[in-house]
Regions:
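Alpha/beta catalytic cores of nucleotide-metabolism and tRNA/nucleoside-modifying enzymes
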Residues: 6, 13-28, 32-172
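Short, small-residue-enriched loops and turns at beta-alpha junctions
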Residues: 2-8
Length: 172
């Protein structure tokens, strides 16, 4: 991972090799983006469990969905309206009266880079969000993409859209 500068695809074959060779439980890690992906990784590698990381920023319901899947229950399907509420909750969590609002907005955008991977397939939300300079401007962007024109009822995809990059510095 380090030698590949964290940009190479996950080597699930090597995880499977470690599972076969190890006498202790092995957990799989790497791009566990959805319940379906977690299940696929478990089946493919034979790992004893999976670690879910940054994709839980994009989809904070991921752990709930995994528990529901494991229990054989119907899996919660968040909507774009749920995502809009999540953004409000994030903002409230990050608010700090001591820090300048501009810095707080920048910190929120770090999270939104991940959330935005599943908002629209063309990356329009991410582009507009990244260019917003004031909280009110950001909330207008969020409302446009997540709530207006009936979008609040649309399902929030389980997987990021292909080619939509969370980290602008990694865009080709």
């Amino acid at each position: 991972t380090v030698k590949e500068m964290y940009r190479a695809p996950v080597h699930y074959d090597l995880i499977a090799h470690a599972v076969r060779r190890s006498r202790v439980p092995v957990l799989a890690n790497g791009e566990i983006s959805s319940v379906a992906k977690a299940q696929w990784v478990l089946e493919t590698t034979g790992a004893h469990g999976v670690m879910m990381g940054r994709h839980a920023i994009r989809n904070p319901w991921l752990f709930r969905q995994w528990r529901e899947h494991q229990a054989g229950q119907s899996v919660f399907q968040p909507t774009l309206g749920d995502v809009r509420q999540y953004l409000d909750d994030l903002w409230q969590t990050l608010l700090d009266p001591v820090k300048p609002e501009k810095h707080q907005l920048g910190y929120l955008k770090k999270f939104l880079n991940f959330v935005g991977q599943s908002v629209d397939p063309d990356g329009g939300f991410l582009k507009q969000m990244r260019h917003s300079r004031e909280p009110d401007e950001l909330w207008r962007v969020a409302d446009t993409w997540l709530v207006e024109a009936g979008r609040a009822a649309l399902p929030y995809p389980a997987e990021p859209y292909p080619g939509i990059i969370a980290r602008p510095s990694r865009e080709a």
